[in-house]
Amino acid sequence: MAERANLVFQNKEIDGTAMKRLISRLIDHFGMGYTSHILDQIKTLGFHQATTTSISLGIEDLLTIPSKGWLVQDAEQQSFLLEKHYYYGAVHAVEKLRQSVEIWYATSEYLKHEMNSNFRITDPSNPVYLMSFSGARGNASQVHQLVGMRGLMADPQGQMIDLPIQSNLREGLSLTEYIISCYGARKGVVDTAVRTADAGYLTRRLVEVVQHIIVRRRDCGTIQAISVSPQNGMTEKLFVQTLIGRVLANDIYIGSRCIATRNQDIGIGLVNRFITTFRAQPFRAQPIYIRTPFTCRSTSWICQLCYGRSSTHGDLVELGEAVGVIAGQSIGEPGTQLTLRTFHTGGVFTGGTADLVRSPSNGKIQFNGDLVHPTRTRHGQPAFLCYIDLHITIQSQDILHSVTIPSKSLILVQNDQYVESEQVIAEIRAGTSALHFKEKVQKHIYSESDGEMHWSTDVYHAPEYQYGNLRRLPKTSHLWILSVSMCRSSIASFSLHKDQDQMNTYSFSVDGRYIFGLSMADDEVRHRLLDTFGKKDREILDYSTPDRIMSNGHWNFVYPSILQNNFDLLAKKRRNRFAIPLQYHQEQEKEPISCFGISIEIPFMGVLRRNTIVAYFDDPRYKKDKKGSGIVKFRYRTLEDEYRTREKDSENEYGSPENEYRTREEECKTLEDEYRTREEEYETLEDEYGIPENEYETLEDEYGILEDEYRTREEESEDEYGSPENKYRPREDKYGTLEEDSEDEHGTLEEDSEEDSEDEYGNPEEDSVLKKGVLIEHRGTKEFSLKYQKEVDRFFFILQELHILPRSSSLKVLDNSIIGVDTQLTKNTRSRLGGLVRVKRKKSHTELKIFSGDIHFPEEADKILGGSLIPLEREKKDSKESKKRENWVYVQWKKILKSKEKYFVLVRPAVAYEMNEGRNLATLFPQDLLQEEGNLQLRLVNFISHENSKLTQRIYHTNSQFVRTCLVLNWEQEEKEEARASLVEIRANGLIRDFLRIGLIKSTISYTRKRYDSRSAGLILHNRLDRTNTNSFYSKAKIQSLSQHQEAIGTLLNRNKEYQSLMVLSASNCSRIGFFKNSKNPNGVKESNPRIPIPKFLGLFRNFSGLLGTIAPSISNFSSSYYLLTYNQILLKKHLLLDNLKQNFKVLQGLKHSLINENQRTSNFDSNIMLDPFQLNWHFLPHDSWEETSAKIHLGQFICENVCLFKSHIKKSGQIFIVNIDSFVIRAAKPYLATTGATVHGHYGEILYKGDRLVTFIYEKARSSDITQGLPKVEQIFEARSIDSLSPNLERRIEDWNERIPRILGGPWGFLIGAELTIAQSRISLVNKIQKVYRSQGVQIHNRHIEIIIRQVTSKVRVSEDGMSNVFSPGELIGLLRAERAGRALDESIYYRAILLGITRVSLNTQSFISEASFQETARVLAKAALRGRIDWLKGLKENVVLGGIIPVGTGFQKFVHRYPQDKNLYFEIQKKKLFASEMRDILFLHTELVSSDSDVTNNFYETSESPFTPFI
């Protein structure tokens, strides 16, 4: 009892770490046996107390935190503000994500701290609190999820879901929260299972590497050592851990007194003496040299002294102990305790959180504004960055506080601002070292609604790749998605309304009419426009759409949409010109289309050469209405044919020379040579555009002719416009070739195949077979010829279908079979025609043709002419009509496969088209204007636009035009080489006429000259400016104010979807904003209620200069508006006065120029430029006075929400698109902020759909060691995989080691020391890295275990090819010690380099093939060993276990070890060598110190990209 009274009574909590300390102290004092008795008593006591207490866990014990409500509310408030800023376009998506994660993370962490204090204060004996905080079960974060808040979760990809789970498990989760938490929960379950498996496999590999390492000797006699010194920044705790249990490599002196000798093991007493010495004399203290497994000289075992004390009983390790297996298990076992991966919060906290500086008191803050620069924080907040230390003063009422802000910090307040106490005034950046690695992360932003994409001038308009749609942002700017309602239609993309026009919503739903497309197939196709001014023709690459003609019932409109800078508008009064009015055709008054598609072509700069085709006219009679495919057949006649004897025998005629029947290609060439010099404008269309040969032909489809009205006309006037369908309706059952299913497009244009070519030109004249007797009769026909021109009198269209299929496709029809309409040919194709099938297999593809028609097997083959075109009996369709139409058939011979005698005749229906002499000019153009001057001549030329017997097959939904009529210009004056053309518009009293004016004199005045822009200026045309919008025209509806039932229409070709789209701007998408009444000149334009059409690309051309007044005529029937669009944003406006409310036309009163310059200042001309309608001239009045006003707003401007322009705030973000005197209308838009370097997807003006990718951000995320943590990190190091990128200075250092050390020392020394240095450095670095991971998880492992493993991993060198030695082959892996010994034994030096192998490779590169085979790849290893004749000396444990021998450890150890007599004398030899040894150590190995992880060498030594030691290999 007396003894017990003297003991200290300890009354405190005891947790896991305290228990560990207690046990270790007991062992030190009492030894193992006595300690076990004491621990038994503690165990009994614990169980007894637990039974008495009977702690149980109930749901009532889960106490929630009272402050949680307002903490969450506060976080929600911040999130709401953040969302608002994002909506305004003030922060971008990455900043929003970062800030959101940070807000909720901070809230969650704060709640965790609150939870601890809450338990401690309210209920310290709470079972939950007791269990988790004693470490018995669970931990704080798990309890936090039970009673605090679950917080942010990661999705399966490891990305943060920025919707936090606000509930805890006590309160219960909502459905959304439950689903989100399932992600994290599932991940946790999977992680646990994977972690267990991974840890087990790691242990197996580790044991495999070191299973043969056994303590076999007392002393290896090494003279190497590792120095340990607290001066290297090592903490005292780490210093003690490193030294205890080691063996000294040198005597240790204090002054002249030796306090410890070599080979003495270090206990706690000796360590304490070292520490007191260091404290007393920190600078004089010498480093302590110790022996470690790294220094042991043995190859495949280890000595007692290098290993040190055994951890189990505190004495030197015994001989025969399997320390390798112990080391492997010591490292592998805690693997299950390591987390597999940290909870990674979206890259926010990896760079270390910033320290905040708070204001010490209320007051006014002041600092030097010149020392700071405005910037954005990583959350998108405005801030100031100070580059040097900044002194801030805070002036409160009675005291002046001074705060110093370190450099590179962010100041979050403004100068002279009033701050409150504890307000955050600055943010100090976390210390970022040069070795802080970053990784680039991509984040995609998707569009939240349908809309049209716009951007500012800050986006490169040239895509990153020539035909791509990706653009880089050179600086931070906004992208806008203008809101639209999508009206989708498979055929509709044209409206009679102009872009930005308003209309009633029901206008096209009640009519039920189709709306057709007016934009070409693709805007981004290249014209090659030739410059005619230079000495050589320079090629200018510009984007342009072909000229086109619009028809709207009352007028034809010319839209030369070649870019503004490609032609001159002439302004000089000349008599040498004439004008062609493009006039409305009187006879067709009731129909909304013009009967002729006259397309005027004004070439580049308006220069016309001789024999230039100035206009095209496509006669609707020669149009193939339905979208079938087929063959055109015709023949040419020369004048001599007229006079040839008609009675000649037909056989002779068939044999007549071929050159009389020239092919269409030659004919076309003649036309080109005679009448055309500028081919590029028209000829290259087919190749480069991929659109039909005739871009003007498709009146129905492209220019808005309504299909139902066209069909009505078809039936009314079958004779004139009869389609193939109508012609064959009477013979439907006979030929079965109705074309109703042939509307879809077909494959490629392909010539008819060789098998029919013998009949193609066989019968150039028309013959008829009278049906009853199969007699052949020849009938001549009349020819129409111009003087020297070969003329076609009649041509035929024969239906045929061709499919080009891949070679591999499986056909569902047989060759020579007969099929019906809509038969399935392959998996995805169906036939449009019925008839005979012919299949031809070629090398690259399979051709499948379908010939329509009947099949006859004639009795006598010689009575049928192959390849004949035969008219059937004439039939009158209408008795009143005197005109007769003929139906023709085309007779073709066909052979039956593999039968030479058997023939059959294919009778195919053909559509005949007659050609007449050409139209009289008077029918096309009024005569009077043409007779103004006799010096210019026009003549008409017809040519066929399809080659003879080529298969005409359309890719697009277009109709084929067979014949084109061209208007060819010529003149008499020999000396004049060129004429000038321009467009003139005359308006007077409701009459509008548009003229093409051609004059022979070059004008002296023109608005603009063509500028040769640099490539960069030209590249602006890359961006898809939608000329559709500027070229469409107004409806006849009057302009009305916005109301509920009106919408504005804009048309656009949608490139990436199959169907075309209409943009409908409804009233819900626009908002009208009234000006403040007293504001001065609100819109900067003094006009009476102007209606200003907005150019889509206003605002794109700020950076380019150009001359004033380039006019792109957009001539329309209603608004009579011109666009003036140049590079410096000139907008031409005009006063529109209503002449008469009942009339649909507005009269041009006068034109007014307004110049909007780069700074959005508007300058108006006082004088008008008047158009004199009677003399067809422009008069320029002198303009002396200027009036300048500055506009607060301008058309096309984008305004963010909540911007204060006037007294009232703007309620919605958007683009200004109507400006009136007292108000303006905003089209709603959603801004997206995009930072520098972001990639924009899509084209300017392109329609995007909800969910389309909009922007890709690339942002840097600090990458520190938390990306892979725990077990994967340990495994990564052991397997020698790349961990981080190598720091640049370290890379240089390794290069130096490899190159210079061998060069300095030369010979064997160089390679020996180079490899030694490298290996020594890498070993220490690796040990530190692994320890860092384990210590971060609270796991204590002795260094020597890790050292044994690392020793094996780094013990190999690779023999290099530098020197040829007979011992090892180049590239062979050998142990470092073996290489050194071989080098000493040989006269010749061995060259080798250090290499690092992972544990798996080391396991397969041991001296024992049995051990390798038992690990992996058994068959390969054994086969290789047999071929090489390897010998296994059975030194390890595994080999003996496999073969059933005695393992060489413990008692079996004695049989394997023989005492060497020189062991006894070893110590004395070492003493003699000591002088040399210490010098060598000083030279080479002083830097191989055990330092803490602060040193950049040890931190980053190992961080190469592939294998860490590739520089040495």
From Swiss-Prot:
Listed cofactors: Zn(2+)
The enzyme's E.C. designation: 2.7.7.6
Biased composition (Basic and acidic residues): 659-679, 726-737
InterPro entries: DNA-dir_RpoC2_beta_pp (IPR012756), RNA_pol_beta''_euk (IPR050254), RNA_pol_Rpb1_3_sf (IPR042102), RNA_pol_Rpb1_4 (IPR007083), RNA_pol_Rpb1_5 (IPR007081), Rpb1_funnel_sf (IPR038120)
GO terms, molecular function: DNA binding; DNA-directed RNA polymerase activity; zinc ion binding
Co-factor remark: Binds 1 Zn(2+) ion per subunit.
Enzyme class: transferase
Compartments where found: Plastid, Chloroplast
Gene3D superfamilies: 1.10.132.30, 1.10.150.390, 1.10.1790.20, RNA polymerase Rpb1, domain 3
Catalytic reaction equation(s): RNA(n) + a ribonucleoside 5'-triphosphate = RNA(n+1) + diphosphate
The keyword Metal-binding appears for this protein: yes
Top-level lineage group: Eukaryota
A Pfam match: RNA_pol_Rpb1_4
Record function comment: DNA-dependent RNA polymerase catalyzes the transcription of DNA into RNA using the four ribonucleoside triphosphates as substrates.
Subunit field text: In plastids the minimal PEP RNA polymerase catalytic core is composed of four subunits: alpha, beta, beta', and beta''. When a (nuclear-encoded) sigma factor is associated with the core the holoenzyme is formed, which can initiate transcription.
NCBIfam families attached to this UniProt entry: rpoC2_cyan
Protein name: DNA-directed RNA polymerase subunit beta''
Organism this protein belongs to: Oryza sativa subsp. indica
Gene that specifies this protein: rpoC2
